[in-house]
Amino acid sequence: MRWKYAAWILIAVVDVMCCSSEEKSASVSFVTRPGSQVIAFPFIFVGHSIVVLPTTKYSNLKRNAKSMEDLTFLLSNLSHVVWSLTIDATVYKDGGRLEKLFDKRMRGYLDGVSLDVLRMYVNGSKTFSELLQIVYERTFECDSRRSRQMARYGESLIREIDNMIESMPAEMSEEEKEKMRSDLNNNRKYVESFHDTEKWRQVVEAEKMVCNTCKEICLGLKEEELMGLLAEGSAKKYIKASAGESKVSSTVYPEYIVVDISLLLDAHREHGGDVTKELVKQMLLGKKEEEIDKRYIGKVANAVKERRRRGEKEIEKRVKKLLRDEEKAKSKKRGKRKSVGVSEAKEEEKKESETEEVEAGEEVEMPSEEVGGARRKTGKKSEGGRKRYKIHRRVLRWRKSPEKIKEEWDKGSEERWRGKSLEEIREQKVFHDIMGVLELLRSPDADRFFMDTGDYTKGGSERQRMVAIGVLESGGKRMLGVVEVGTFKDCPSGCPVVYHLMFRVTGIEGMGDVMRRGGGQSW
């Protein structure tokens, strides 16, 4: 085995990265610069087609069995792929001493990691993005309290390199010995970094950030837009250059980026997720590593800020128009209400009586008593001019766990909610689990924040819609939008019932006050 390590330009050969079950020896070379690192994207291609996305679960793969054999081979060697992309700066020679050492000290450990995560993927509900992050964590063991396998392997490598330096073949010329000694010393210096836990912790952190960013990008783009973004990635370019166009069409491979991870992590901490997302998009589009420096990141950050500013200006414009339209609507006479049959009205009343009254200072979980098909709180009555509302069970449902919500939906009668994934439910829960808004709605000052958009009749019951402008803070993001509250009159008490409660996003970042999900708000 001979290591190419001249002037800190690292030439790496990846033997598992581009492979198929029939032809596993294909390889692709790539170059990294000083301080740079190869990071895997959570995408897998077969030829020009994306077959695995960050959000792909194993159950999704089984529906398309065409490439399952090749995919299973790659997935069952996923830790070797990660190792080759991240560490393996070697060119193997048959029978090489360092190759044998790798087989003895490291290969078995990586095989075990691959097998464990493959079982986890097949038998669980992990997405490929989550799986890839686990592979990085287990391969580099940065949080392990025990001696890391990578560090132990590094110690063995250093001893072997020292032996190779001391026992160079006598038949070699002095010039050849000097060249070999220089290469081996460079390799030894690199292997010493195997003990640098903080360095590999940064690699794992960068991988997690890229995986999560790619997931956000995927969820926000249509399939054709995503294909355009990934039309010509780094791996595909190198396969073409190395083996030709014909090789690409039959190859299973992951995409990757070469990047200065310290620069990328600093940009994420300083500028936030929106700038990171734009940087990753540019990398997916083929932006070269040497083009991404602090100056370029600054330009991207300024462009994102300008886009936000324009968006906020447009939102303000729309909000003002909405307010004008609502004022006009309030000044007009209410149209004649449609009449409905008595039986229909009773059915609507019965359906929407499944409500729960929530008063100030009370917890939703406190004991309740059944009253005519409705659950009524037994707490204190409203005082001091505070308004009183009952809460429909469809609103209260959002306070439950995603698993419980899914269980109820799958058993329910509403067709549009059946079969929703836990991932979709978690995303929607952010915008629906905002019960803290009701505290403001009940207060005497509610009219300062909520605007009544008028009454209308549906199913024999009088309904009212109110809106308020606010900012929802969740997951480190501030989202500008409109709080929507829909109510109808309960019979026979006449108490308003909140049957619709939602935060509708109109922009990221923004003006105004902040509403925190699931509890207290600061308006």
Curated annotation (Swiss-Prot):
It holds the Pfam family DUF1609. It comes from the Eukaryota. Residues 354-368 have a biased composition (Acidic residues). Residues 330-339 have a biased composition (Basic residues). Residues 344-353 have a biased composition (Basic and acidic residues). Residues 326-386 are annotated as: Disordered. Belongs to the UPF0329 family. This is UPF0329 protein ECU02_0050. It comes from Encephalitozoon cuniculi (strain GB-M1).
